[in-house]
Amino acid sequence: QGADIIAVIRTTGQSLLDYVPYGATTEGFGGTFATQENFRIMRTALDKVGEDVGRYIRLCNYCSGLCMPEIAIMGAFEGLDVMLNDALYGILFRDINMQRTLVDQYFSRIINGFAGVIINTGEDNYLTTADAVEAAHTVLASDLINEQLALLAGLPQEQMGLGHAFEMDPALENGFLLELAQAQMTREIFPKATLKYMPPTKFMTGNIFKGHLQDALFNMVGIWTNQGIQLLGMPTEAIHTPFMSDRFLAIENAKYIFSNMKNIGDEMEFKEGGIIKTRAKEVLNNAIELLQKLTSEGLFNALEKGIFGDVKRSRTGGKGLSGVVAKGSNYMNPFINLMKGRK
């Protein structure tokens, strides 16, 4: 139908499995099990369709949860192009222990970097639990943290799909300008990153006509500010799992706007002292202030206080801490140097 990337959602709850299921599966709840065989089946199917339509179609899946390195390896083996890999998402939204997650994200990102897989981070999720206007600076701060952790893992900036979202209340006066400010600011701060831009979900009501308009405004911001990966919004968001016809309408919406407004970003400049520049400076300054606070307090303390997404987590709580052990004096993982040495 025209999409460049197909993201296959995982079955509900797989993040919390401390093992990877084996083989092809025929059922799932809200998604499909991430197994190596399923990855192979998906990749083979997309390659066949790609031959028919004359272009390569990228495949995206998820290596978040309690098996980040294991699923990253499976994705590398089976030719996945994009994988969800966030340093903080599992802590905040799946209650996975913060020590476990930060260890796992490091090695899994080394694998992603070595395999040429683009990672996507999940800052958009903060705006489903916190207000998109008030919490905008926490999204930027998290993007910067995710970027630095990815660099430590040897991941090139071009493989960083740092996340943010179009999630402000549509009733907000000049909300489009504030969304535009956020997107342009993010693009300028991360000029090489393949930014991941998420569509409106929080304020989708089931009114498919208004929803299609909200998605159109989102697509306008995306092409205007040259976002890297545009996750398409569905007109039936908040009603049911999208039909193929809904996906077709979403692709048609995006292709129309992306073509019709292709070079708008090259033609427009932002007014000094105007709403957009003023908003971007405000968000940036608040993010800097937050990061300075984190420098003195530490990341774990910030997570315990609920600074990100208004979600509080304990450093010794959550799932998976029993899988974390201190490195012995003779510990060695040869793959870390081998994989990072390639870059």
Identify the meaning behind each predicted range.
Residues 1-166, 171:
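Catalytic alpha/beta active-site cores
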Residues 5, 154-159, 192-196, 263-278:
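Flexible, glycine/charged-enriched surface loops at secondary-structure junctions
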Residues 32, 61, 135, 169-176, ...:
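Hydrophobic alpha-helical scaffolding
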Residues 39-53, 179, 183-190, 258-261:
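Surface-exposed amphipathic alpha-helices with a cationic face
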Residues 68-82, 142-145, 176-183, 219, ...:
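Short, electropositive alpha-helical surface patch
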Residues 95-105, 235-262:
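C-terminal helical cap(s) of enzyme catalytic domains, especially alpha/beta-barrels
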Residues 182-246, 264-271:
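Hydrophobic alpha-helical bundle architecture
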Residues 253-343:
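Long, compositionally biased intrinsically disordered regions
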